[in-house]
A protein has these predicted regions:
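Conserved, structured core segments of small domains
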Residues: 1-116
Length: 116
């Protein structure tokens, strides 16, 4: 069994507004997905992210830290959340990614986690 991180990227400009029926439908879809992941014993961690404007990037060059508000790349899709799941192999990770609601209209990027 290996752990994988699932990074959910979506178009923030198309994200439903707080309190809208569309957002409630998305919340319901993620709750159903989370229930399925937990029932399978695959869930380790996961949470949504705040809007991209709340994020920041830090880089260090020549010993000097530079902090930039907002997403690292202005035109990039929004990293709106993540899951860490235990999967028996890549095929199972691909199956969970395909079921993730963010993959339907967005992208779920999957990385195996290197255990040290």
């Amino acid at each position: 069994m290996a752990s994988y991180i699932f990074l959910q990227y979506v178009d923030e400009s198309k994200a439903p507004k707080w309190g809208s029926p569309e957002l409630n439908a998305q919340i319901d879809a993620f709750a159903k997905y989370l229930d399925e992941v937990k029932a399978a014993g695959a869930f380790k961690d996961g949470d949504p992210c705040q809007p991209s404007a709340a994020g920041f990037s830090v880089s260090v060059r020549d010993g000097q830290a530079k902090t930039t508000d907002g997403p690292m790349h202005a035109q990039s899709p929004w990293l709106n959340g993540y899951f860490v799941l235990d999967c028996k192999d890549r095929a199972e990770a691909e199956a969970w990614a395909a079921k993730n609601p963010a993959a339907h209209g967005g992208t779920v990027e999957v990385h195996p986690i290197l255990s040290l």
